Amino acid sequence: MLHPLLRHLPLALALALCAAGAAQAKNLVVCTEASPEGFDIVQYTGAVTADASAETVFNRLLAFRPGTTEVIPGLAERWDVSADGLSYTFHLRPGVKFHTTDYFKPTRSLNADDVLWTFQRALDPKHPWHASALRGYAYFDAMGMGELIKSVEKVDELTVRFVLNRPEAPFLRDMAMPFASIYSAEYGDQLLAAGKQGQLNNQPIGTGPFVFKRYAKDAQVRYTANPDYYAGKPPIDNLVFAITLDPNVRMQKVRAGECQVSLYPKPEDVPRLKQDPNLAVDEIDALLTTYIAINTQHKPLDDPRVRQAINLALDKKAMLDAVFGPGAASPAVGPYPPTLLGYNHSIQDWPHDPERARALLKEAGAENLRITLFIRNGTSPTIPNPALAAQMLQADLAKAGIQLTIRSLEWGELLKRSKAGEHDLSLLGWAGDNGDPDNFLSPNLSCAAAESGENQARWCDKDFEALMRKAREVSDPAERAKLYEQAQVVFHEQAPWIPLAYPKLFNVRRNTVQGYVINPLSNNNFATTSVKP
């Protein structure tokens, strides 16, 4: 445990004192933008939570090549797919070790039982661990995995077979996503026997590059390098996520060397940061969408005319110029960026037309509309200045006769309340997890996701659902593209969102940091990162 005196010292100084006791310890401090919601990753969809668990503690059967959306082997060293696309057989790496900690000491290596435990926990309501996910299986349910997966079978100690009820084009990509992280069945059995199921969300065990040490909410998460990592021990010895909500403070810390990596600077600061000889700025056209979900279950927001009016009232260009700055984001028209399959370039964005908005509101009997917008109290790559965006929306809506109240909430609280349907509007962002269009649509716009609350527009449209489902089942890219183009027409006409932006992704690091790769999927993995003396 950290000495009481050290708790009151700045993070960098505390690390320096620790390093003095450990001579050549190599530390990496990353300034992150928010606290993780927990560490039982199957319960959550937030990118911050995935970085703190899936990218550090856990692995999946498959992985993405760093900096790309190419699927590569993970815990499975190879796989076979049946000719009918209904059977996927994964061959596990031998000798992969789970973490050894003060609270768990494994007696065996990874095997098929761990894969079965992981997926049957979510699939089977009678599984002894099923009810332990107090927030449910957010991604799993939103993507319809329960109805997709017919069975998960143990072929032998190192072979697992998934049998599907229907073909699923993005299934291999899905198996590389955070929600598919593989847990230790032995650790689960230990906690269950002790009646300590809640510990899984506070003290995770995985096979990943870093071993969890401790978490201080809104302060830091600490890890040590996994000496037994199957891909080789990471170059650094200690990894610290220093939770720093204010992007200005994050930049001050990286300039001062208190952090070696600082995530998500304000776009307007990027040109100045690039001029600092001690810093390097990484940027990429990421798979990101910024949007405002409109709660279609609240009257009169259940009327598409009202939702269209809200879209028409917004001066989107002015907002993007002010919030993101020149060249840092392009206007969003649909639910996913134009780099993905089936983006419909023929759809024209809603123009800024407050008079037409007023007319639609009058036609719908929704004049003098009063609604509430939820925003986060920190920043993120999808929305670098939530308060400014909210204020600009408020002013634009007022010109159309709509009174908007703004509520600023801590990120975890915003997600909790929005998923419970308390909002009228909620300012959100989505980071693609696998490079497939379905990853934007199913978790955020499907009927299953509306029921679970992940679809925060609570929009369930049978025509959209049918197109999306068919696109998942066909393997031909051209046919899938046509289906997605049609689905986007339905989305545009029904207007469950205000699509705002497709932002670029920026991260800042000291130029002594090597081996860090910025990812279009917005995940941050430090397994290969090193720091020069």
Swiss-Prot record:
GO biological process: dipeptide transport; protein transport
GO molecular function per UniProt: peptide transmembrane transporter activity
A GO CC term assigned to this protein in UniProt: ATP-binding cassette (ABC) transporter complex
Pfam family, one: SBP_bac_5
Endpoints of the signal sequence: 1-25
SUPFAM superfamilies associated with the record: Periplasmic binding protein-like II
Alphabetically ordered keywords of this record: Peptide transport, Protein transport, Signal, Transport
Keyword presence, Metal-binding: no
UniProt key word Transport: yes
Family recorded in the similarity comment: Belongs to the bacterial solute-binding protein 5 family.
Role played: Part of the ABC transporter DppABCDF involved in the uptake of various di/tripeptides. Prefers dipeptides with acidic residues at the C-terminal end. Efficiently uses tripeptides.
Assembly description: The complex is composed of two ATP-binding proteins (DppD and DppF), two transmembrane proteins (DppB and DppC) and a solute-binding protein (DppA4). Five orthologous SBPs (DppA1-A5) are present in P.aeruginosa, which increases the substrate specificity of the DppBCDF transporter.
UniProt-recorded name of the protein: Di/tripeptide-binding protein 4
Organism placement in taxonomy: Bacteria, Pseudomonadati, Pseudomonadota, Gammaproteobacteria, Pseudomonadales
